[in-house]
Amino acid sequence: ITQTKDNGNLFDIDAQNVGLLETLKVKNHSFGLGYQQIIGESAYPLPDGFLPETYFINWNTTGFFKQDEKSYHFIYGYDFKDYVPGLNTTFKYVYGDHFKTADGLKNKESEANVIVNYALQQPFLKGLALQYIFINYDVKHGNDFSENRFFVNYSKKF
């Protein structure tokens, strides 16, 4: 059962997203470090539901968009092009804090991702790629979850 209360503030939104994500590439390695903060009197609005929002510094399953939330982003990637052409991996960890639950409890959350991409190299399979994503989400007050996602991607230049 869901209860709602009409307080006349249906579109009273006050939220700004401030963030910076920098990436350093050294040979086959990439290192990323980022910070994002939601400022205002409400959570950051997501007009499309929760799709990957391009104005956040980093794509995450859970978003890190809650009112007053501060999140810290750490990314490491490796391109195996010298050993297995077409294979690359990314490891992401995000920690968010300084936000509260609907009941007013101080909360924190974290998300870890392992992403493996492989673009098939055979000429007759050109444009075909496979992707695996493992997602682990932990939250102090709420529901933790883990997901395994598999994708088959095909791209063609016209």
Residue map of PLM features:
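Residues that define the transmembrane beta-barrel architecture of outer-membrane proteins
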Residues: 14-18, 68-72, 106-112, 144-148
